[in-house]
Swiss-Prot record:
The keyword Disulfide bond applies. The lineage of its organism: Eukaryota, Metazoa, Ecdysozoa, Arthropoda, Hexapoda. It is found in: Secreted. Lipids and biogenic amines bind independently through different binding pockets. Probably modulates blood feeding of fleas on vertebrate species by binding and sequestering different mediators involved in the host response. Binds histamine. Binds leukotriene B4, leukotriene C4, leukotriene D4 and leukotriene E4. Does not bind serotonin, adrenaline, noradrenaline, ADP, and stable analogs of thromboxane A2: U-46619 and cTXA2. GO terms for molecular function: phosphatase activity. The keyword Signal applies. This is Acid phosphatase-like protein XcAP-2. Belongs to the histidine acid phosphatase family. Residues 1-19 form the signal peptide. It comes from Xenopsylla cheopis (Oriental rat flea). Gene3D superfamilies: Phosphoglycerate mutase-like. GO terms for cellular component: extracellular region. Its main location: secreted. Keywords: Disulfide bond, Secreted, Signal.
Length: 378
């Protein structure tokens, strides 16, 4: 009898060891690589270049191409792709021209074109292939004219804001001596990102901008942006809920064996790549990291989640032998940083899709409800 039981246990273990989750689809959300230092919307004037006119630097072009190569190396064989084809098995999209150029360069890296493409002048037709104007709705929440209720709600938390900015008070005092227009809470974050690029690009007259000042600005930037995106469930929903709804729509279709909406490859699509600004990476993270989420083995904090240049979030969708679907969230917070797994509360690293959706559903929102929550003008 004992022998029979032992044999059954061994057979069960063998069967479990044979069970395998097969990667079916990857949803990539990537922050931009290096571009010309510029002034960001809702920010003070620091340079002579506005954000929509800021071009990728040569380093940025190279980094975008290399990121495409990294994606291909990571996923081509795992997804069972023989040859990448934008009409069949991957979809690269962006919201504005600078990012369509980056998406095109990443695409070139994915399909292993020569690196000389980084100096190529792309045609309007080539750039249009990566354009997806509907992405602009995801930016609604940061526009004071389009989402006044959200902005007003944030500004009503003045005590919390003052506490955060008090941690970089000395740095801000020095910054204001050189740029008096830095006088709003969001300016701390926006000037940090501008100064970072100016230092990388060796701009002149920045001797006063010490490493200590940059460290203080970075810490405040991380806290103020994470606070604005996650201070309440409602804020999470407004900042990232539209994107989450879009992701659910795509994953629902894929798990039902149906075509991914709008993807050129339809049901054959294996990877979607969104190239987005930092603010959308933050809002995306806000709706996939509810309280209790772990990044690696640690609790999520403003500092360990803040996306620097080269950051990306991958949602990996797996299918098991029993037609069961699971999602794994992989995050890299910047160039040279290691991959980390984001684990939802009560879930293993590969979270059953139904549970994944159940946990995060509270943050999903329709376009009409988002407009109402924003106070979007009729």
């Amino acid at each position: 009898m004992k022998t029979t039981i032992l044999l059954l246990v061994v057979l069960t273990i063998v069967q479990l060891s044979k069970a395998k989750d097969n990667l079916q689809f990857v949803f990539v959300t990537a922050k931009g690589q290096d571009h010309q230092a510029c002034n960001y919307p809702q920010g003070p004037k620091i340079t002579n270049i506005e954000e929509p006119d800021s071009e990728l630097t040569e380093d940025g072009k190279k980094e975008a191409y290399e990121f495409g190569q990294k994606l291909s190396s990571e996923y081509k064989s795992r997804l069972g792709v023989t040859k990448w084809d934008s009409a069949q098995n991957y979809w690269a999209i962006a919201a504005i021209e600078k990012r369509t150029k980056k998406a095109t360069l990443i695409t070139a890296g994915v399909i292993a074109k020569r690196q000389s493409v980084t100096s190529k002048t792309w045609s309007d037709e080539e750039l249009q292939k990566t354009s997806f104007p509907a992405l602009n709705d995801f930016f609604r929440f940061i526009n004071p004219q389009h989402c006044p209720k959200y902005i007003k709600s944030i500004l009503s938390k003045q005590n919390d804001i003052n506490t955060i900015l008090g941690k970089c008070e000395a740095a801000l005092k020095t910054v204001k001596e050189h740029y008096p227009a830095v006088n709003k809470p969001q300016h701390t974050w926006l000037v940090y990102e501008t100064f970072k690029r100016m230092k990388q690009q060796k701009a002149s007259n920045l001797e006063w901008l010490t490493d200590d000042i940059m460290k203080q600005l970075q810490a405040c930037s991380a806290e103020i942006t994470w606070f604005a995106a996650t201070n309440s469930d409602e804020w999470r929903k407004i900042s990232g809920g539209l994107l989450l709804t879009d992701i659910f729509t795509d994953l629902d279709q894929i798990t039902q064996g149906k075509p991914q909406p709008y993807a050129p490859g339809g049901a054959n699509n294996k990877m979607s790549l969104f190239t987005v600004p930092q603010v959308l990476v933050i809002s995306h993270l806000a709706v996939i990291t509810p309280p209790g989420t772990k990044i690696g083995s640690k609790d999520v904090t403003a500092q360990n989640i803040y996306p620097e240049d080269g950051a990306y979030v991958n949602l990996e969708l797996f299918k098991g032998d029993k037609e069961d679907w699971k999602v794994k969230i992989v995050y890299v917070k910047g160039k040279g940083e290691p991959q980390q797994t984001i684990a939802l509360p009560g879930c293993p690293e590969k979270c059953p899709y139904n549970k994944f959706k159940q946990i995060l559903q509270q943050y999903a929102i329709s376009d009409d409800d988002h407009k109402k929550a924003c106070g979007f003008p009729a």
